[in-house]
Amino acid sequence: MQKRYHIHVNALLGQVVPASFARRWRCVFGVVALLLVLLCPALSHAQAHVNDTTRTRNIKEVVVKANRGARAVGMIKQTAEQLKVEMPADMTDLVRYMPSVGVSISGSRGGMRGFAMRGVEANRVAISIDGILQPDIQDNVVFSSYGLSNASRIDFDPYLASSVEIQRGANSFVSGNGALGGTVNYNTKNARDLIVQGKQWGAFAHVGYNGKDNLRTYIGGGAALWKHWEALLLATRRDGNELRNFAYGQRTRNITSTQADPISFAQHAWLAKLAYVPNEHHRLDWAFYAMNRKADAEIWTLEPIDAFTAEGKPYYYSHDQSLTRQASMGYRFTSDVAFVKKLAARLHYQVSYLDATTWTDYYRPNFDQHNGNMTLLHEGKRDKYRAQEIGDALVRLSLDTRKLSLGALGQHNLNFTTTASLRNYSSRNVDVENPVAANTIDGYTVRRGKVYALGENMGTTAQAYAFLNPIRRFNLAVSLLDDAALSPVLNLKLGLRYDLFHTTDDADNQARNTGYIAYLLQNVQGANMDFSPINNVQGGISALAVLAFTPKSWFNVAYKFSTGYRVPNIEEQYFQYYSTWPSFLVMSNRDLKPEKSINHELEITGKTNALAYMFSAYYNHYADFIELRQGVLTVSEPLMSQEKRLAYVTNVNRDHAHLVGFDAALQLYPDAWCPALRGVSLSSAWSYAQGESSSGMSMLSVQPLAGNVGLAYTGANSRWEVNAKMNFHFAKPVSQTTFWDRDAAGRDLIRRFPAAFLQNAYTFDIYAYYKIGTHITLRAGVYNLFDTQYHRWDDLRQLTNPALLGNINLFFKDGRKSLARFTQPRRYLSAAVEINI
């Protein structure tokens, strides 16, 4: 049994930031100076009025809390009302006004791989629903390189959320595995979110349209209170198509096509909750959530390796389905006098399916020896199915004590949490062929003793197989948190968490699942693939420390130290593959170590009746990044006269990386010094970071300098509101786009994005709502008002994903015209009607 542990103890070893970082920060000083110029006069005016207001001042991007506690440093919280106002259609819309957060795009089949923050993305940023981690992406180099798998992250409908919490920076103490760069947590709605105070029931309906991708949204539901019971039921449906951007020209089969692949999708989601509250101390609740997303596409821009298709048709057709069902039951006890202030227990079960279907008609070139012409003979249809099933079961117990007074050491609240979870993962592949007789010389084809006329269907053959046995991963986590008030103005949080992971497989099914690979390799010597049973133990310690000094409501300063880790997922660590043509190997690596991250962050916040502000500076260190290593093996076969060289790839722990950056946000309320401007507010948010790996390569997930400036006016009694945003999308410096590539001979190359690809852009959005009476709200927005053609860095860096990287030189040669299908949306309208009863 293998046994490995890692401890985040190198936090304070003083890693040196390269001097080049300092030289490149001049470009951001102007932004910081502008914020300070706006901030200083407002602060001086506000100090005299700080006790005269009861209004809550929130930065829309970052909620500023001036309470006497250690606040959540690096936290962005979007409320349900903010989500309604901004009308997000997907992950991209959810973070469009958060310059410090991006999205991860798969580069194939339109999949969203999750979020990007603090220089990392996808599986390195955890996603949770009500604090329960969601499945990560289980993908491998074989399927991702040809776009043959459903590589999207299971999404959550934001309209079913009461709030969305985005915690930037290493967060494994709270979220566990995968929170290297942060966590995105969706808090689901409760019955009281739909019920107006004083009523016993409520209902909600929403019909919306978003021109970005021709999205039609329908939402409906209701909630009720009856005696000690609370009930909620919500359902959503979304139908849409591919992004409507600046793609142009004729749709052709070409990796650099200027047209986007046609896509249609439908997504349904349901949320049901039932709670029994006998008194103020006890609460029982049951919850059910389900989401089913189906997407159909014609793939014109990714060429399969094993099919010759006809001109005028796509390379292949695809159908992807993402389905998840989640059920949970919880109990909560609260008391104002007992030693245990709060006791919470939760049982959770979830099953998720990620299915990908790919099919194409394939042809054989037929050359006329007399005139040299070539025709294509239809040889049949080929289907490839790939299915992944992920089952999660979880038990969690959490206990909070009342305040414990320790004299000069202050008051302490302790939290103890333990979690046990079990993940079951399995994948299956099915290849189906429907061949057609295509022997033009004889006019017939003999197959398995039967004669088929030219063009006749010759039946169906199917092969089912898997590259991995079903795998189980058990996780036990124990954490202790001390939330201490050392004085009225000084607070401290200290937390420590330990996670144990035990991974095993179903070895009894080895012959059924992986036997055919063993058959292919039985005579190949030197290709060391590992088919032994899996029995692996890994462990990790996570830490959290927050020291907050809050002398005034208008000035709070906090320092945060936190760590993160990510245990290699199943496909990364155990997937292995052998291809006879082209000949290459994918080798597993059972010795992979968990990835680790360390976050240091200093944050200054404050609020008055005139403003709310936030400035955060951070340094992140990452270690043991898991990346692909390519090489060549020398293998032999008994019937071969000489050895041959066989290319291989495998995952290894290779790079370390570091990142420095800042986030800033400011909200101004000019009516504090000019009552005539009541209802007017000004906002601005900015972010910049720069990172580099130990190999000298850039951290491509790092967002370039970005920001926005907003102007809002809210009418009396919040009956109507209009918002205007100017968005600044600055170009990524060429020096920060360095990455590895390989030439045709397999030699490593260092590349950078062409300067012509990297351009600044400025866009404008206007969105508003108007309430008709107390039950109806009209919402509308126009985005990219001046129809600006531009790319965000998230659009460009998907060229380095496995499905596109092998052809990136074609994009570089063709120039910006080859990027048309990756552009951001054209000017579009978003509108909705809401009814609240």
Question: Where do the PLM segments sit?
Answer:
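Outer-membrane beta-barrel signature, preferentially recognizing the C-terminal barrel domain
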Residues: 309-336, 467-471, 526-542, 546, ...
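Outer-membrane beta-barrel translocator/receptor signature
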Residues: 146, 159-168, 173-247, 254, ...
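Flexible loop and strand-edge segments within Gram-negative outer membrane beta-barrel domains
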Residues: 48, 261-267, 281-340, 351-369, ...
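Acidic, small-polar-rich N-terminal luminal/periplasmic segments of exported/outer-membrane proteins
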Residues: 57-194, 602
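Gram-negative outer-membrane beta-barrel transporters
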Residues: 487-488, 492, 618-622, 626, ...
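Periplasmic-side early beta-strands and strand-to-turn transitions of outer-membrane beta-barrels
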Residues: 200, 214, 221-317
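C-terminal beta-signal and adjacent terminal beta-strands/loops
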Residues: 623-624, 628, 680, 730-744, ...
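Surface-exposed extracellular loop regions of Gram-negative outer-membrane beta-barrel proteins
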Residues: 294, 300-307, 353, 455, ...
